[in-house]
């Protein structure tokens, strides 16, 4: 097929392929696009790839303008979870899929979408025809000609934004928007990036496992894998980013917990480079003889990174499209004439733009439009332990607590979770960290008399422990809304909030999801996960919550 006549009139040309295979067909398509002087500015390819871990995988590409999403799921499930407008479908050898996929193909088809197919059954051709596809005589080519009007594409936003917050959430937002050609102003009250919750010496990056593969597990898996790929594009761990992919060993809490983990290992067929269950002898051998009484999970590709260095790498990648307004103190936010305007305590305008992204953690509660969001500030204290006071570890070790290998003669241990608003180091929190460290190492004398040293940060946490990613809801205008898509939103106001202790992992993919959504691109996550992260979920939950006793008349 000659794609050139199809993509020359589109700003983005999206292809869905039911078989990635060895990638050769995708490379041919990309080569054709690259060499066409009349090509669309952007080529987005979505393909099924069964050998990957379950879910959606956004694969960063060196080629500007090319996006590749690989999905590990059955065809019907993948299409049902896809948020996209597809211009071309390539369906290969799907006769075993039945006919349910046809309605999902029609749902994501763009106006005048085309279809190439091999091996369709008569029932599948009939199902696609019933959904609005008109086939050629050969039964292998079709065009979407549904009489149902396609939902109008959202208007192209003006590509200027303010990002409030220069921590891990804000830096990721700036980098993902600048990568799309946006002009971004990052505003922060501190004089340097990553001076608040993102300022720890070390953050742990690792996946999450669960028996039921629940929402936090699926989100964290997708975000972890995206982060590893994206960080390589930024220069890599140990190079542009300070840290080490030394691996993480997560010990089982007790014998019962170990049995649950063995069941996960037996049922998931996880690749060893992603996660491997180690029994006690293997775990203790890895730790050089330290106790690991109930075994644990080894995440070989995981490790630690200094969040501030990740922020710096992302902000540096923005180039000349980024303006930094740091050290401005607290700001006042107003909407005026289609613009968001930030002014400092002296009434001087710091920045203005049609789009504002709140990435300032618990500080979002001070913004009137975000104040109804049920966000909580939780204090976390990390202890800095002299390296000669604890065993030298080849990996990050964690259970209820964590301990990193040494960096600069210091190991990080922690961290506490409490509601104390005091930003000063607390001897009680330090003692709590050391007590849990001794339990982790099975050594009652580890780090004995370690001096009070460390850092305090404040996490922003949502009631469901999931992040808030997307356009912020207007609680006052919500009325009797029952569906997420119908919730009224504040114009040009977005949130990247509620990262709790997983900002290092969640930030990159969350920012990519936000930027893709603003631009009207195919989304990098399943729609069920997108909905689970939508800030407007709390509007619906507030409506559905049981009311207390009503006063009698």
Give the label of every model feature segment.
Residues 140, 148-180, 189-190, 194-209, ...:
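Active-site substrate-recognition segment that forms the wall
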Residues 202-286:
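Dinucleotide-binding Rossmann-like beta1-alpha1 core, especially the glycine-rich loop
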Residues 211-212, 240-250, 274, 280-318, ...:
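Helix-loop-beta segment of a Rossmann-like dinucleotide-binding subdomain
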Residues 51-81:
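S-adenosyl-L-methionine
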Residues 99-111:
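A short glycine-rich, Lys/Arg-flanked "PGG" loop and its adjoining helix->strand segment in the class I
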Residues 297-346, 350-355, 359-360, 364:
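Helical element adjacent to the flavin cofactor pocket in flavoenzyme catalytic cores
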Residues 449-553:
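C-terminal catalytic lobe of FAD-dependent flavoproteins
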Residues 2-58:
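SAM cofactor-binding core of SAM-dependent methyltransferases
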